[in-house]
Every structure is written in C-alpha cells, then in structure tokens.
Amino acid sequence: MPTEQVTLTEEMIGWRLDRALASLITRLSRERLKNLISSGCVSNSQGALVRDPAFKIKSLDCFTVDIPLPRPAHNEPQDIPLEIVFEDEHLLVVNKPAGMVVHPAAGNYDNTLVNALLYHCAGKLSGIGGVARPGIVHRIDKDTSGLLVVAKTDPAHAGLAAQFADHSINRRYRAIVDGHPSLQGHVDAPLARSSVNRQKMAIVSDGRGKRAVTHYRMITPLKNASLIECRLETGRTHQVRVHMSSIGHSLLGDPVYGRSKKAHHALLQSLAFQRQALHAAHLGFIHPISGKQVDFDAEMPQDMQLLFKMLMISNRN
C-alpha cells in the first residue's frame, strides 16, 4: 500500500486536517483525503490514528497517509430485470426495487443498478459520472425503493445535474412513520456525517452541515402510525429518515434511525419487513433535451402495500 509522509508548515496552524493534507498532497482531492482520514488511513508522528477530517492543527506535526490501491471497477453488464418506467435516446426512468445498490462500491461489486443498466443499455450511458457510476445522476438508499432518472448521454446528464443542483427537481416520497405527525409541516435542519458514527447522518449546528429541507403531509392515519408524503426541497443522504426521526416520527422498519414500538416490531417481524418503509413515488423534471415538463409516478411496492393494509386493519379493530 503506497504511503505519503508530510510535514505541516507554520501557516497551517488552526487549519482543518483535510485542508492541510490537500494542500500538501495535491494529487488527491480534498474529498478523497476526507474519506481516507475517516477510514483510519491517517496517523500522526506518534502513530495514533486521526479519524476526524475537521481535526484542528495545533502544532507542527508529521502525518502518514496510507493510500489503498484503487480496486478495478467491477462494472460488468448483468442481465438483471429492471422496471423501466420511461425511456428515450437521452435518458430513462427506472423503478428501483428495495435491496438493490445503485452503483458498485465496497462490499457490493455486482448485482447493482449500474450492472443492470450496462446490460440494458448495451453500455450506452453518460460518462460524466466516471467509470464507477455511468449514467448515475442521483441515488436513493439500497433499502429504499422507487424512481431514479438515469442519463444515457452527456448533455442529458449535465442538464439533469443542473436541475438537481438548483433543487428544481420534484421528488416526493411515501413513508410509513411511527405515530401521528401534524397534518402538514416541514423540517429545516442541516445534515452532516455523525461525529460519533460515520455510517450515520445527523442534524448538526456546528457549521459542518448542508441545508436540508423536508416538507411532509399526512395521507392516512393508521394504528399508531401514519402514511405520509414527503417532498424534498433538498436531497441529502438519509434526509427523510433523519428529519422524521428528529420530530419523533421515525420510519417503520428503519434499522438505523428507527424506534419502533413493540406492536410495530411484532408486525414487522410477522411480515418479514426488514427495511425502512420509504418509497420514491414521484419524480418530475424538465426534460434536458426537449425542454418539456415530465412527471412519473410509481405505486408503493408489495411489501409496503401489505404493511399499510395490515395497519389499516388494526386501525379498524
């Protein structure tokens, strides 16, 4: 494994560690160095690992950065069935099933949406996302089902990415949450990686977070639960899950942010429902080539429909 050894300069006192390393190791991006720090690949002159990219430099120390060799992209085309909602020569909209990872990454090098798309599109996907993420403009979590738009050409990718950047994409989710939130409301709270658990996102007030806004409305009150619609003004990682949990209405089945009541726990077990009850139900945007507004809808998958039905039955009893 290649290593880089660097010595800090006096002007870096008070800087964040990731900023200092990025100024010294210019061949690596700051984002890449952030990931290396968080992954335990950076140690100080005493050999102690430093895992916080925001660690403030207090003295002229030396740091060693271990740089893992890149693993070849495992983007082999695979004949995996896809539910294509719309397709033309520029883009396609797919209804992703729960359990499918969007693109290859550590621990998931095949059976991803990208593998399926490479087969379906015969490799004709936008290259802007790089070899690891061809055609991928945005993502949804592995265990979230629903609609994604995929770019087949670079102009389509650029046009879609611009709409995601200016938050003009209309994204609406269906979620089954614990309890009964207000008939409508919104959560405006910045999100960042948790400083305690890097696998989780958290609402933060220390300036690290990116603005995140979720609007929600009640659709159907259920037995100690509710079916709601969430409209995303922004699209941060785990946004709906963290925001709804923060107001006391976590998603049923959510293994990370959930706090299911005993009755819900028993029902989820009986249905073998092992994911967050979240579905990307609506996607609307301006077609990047034609300039026309397009809107797509996808019904909740069978597992969420069954959960909803059982909660409705319980509500009547």
Curated annotation (Swiss-Prot):
Source organism per UniProt: Zymomonas mobilis subsp. mobilis (strain ATCC 31821 / ZM4 / CP4)
S4 RNA-binding domain span: 15-89
Catalytic residues (UniProt): 141
Chief place of localization: cytoplasm
Biological processes per GO annotation: enzyme-directed rRNA pseudouridine synthesis
Gene encoding the protein: rluD
Name of the protein this chain belongs to: Ribosomal large subunit pseudouridine synthase D
Domain of life assignment: Bacteria
Highest classification ranks of the organism: Bacteria, Pseudomonadati, Pseudomonadota, Alphaproteobacteria, Sphingomonadales
Matching PROSITE patterns: PSI_RLU, S4
Annotated Pfam families: PseudoU_synth_2 (PF00849)
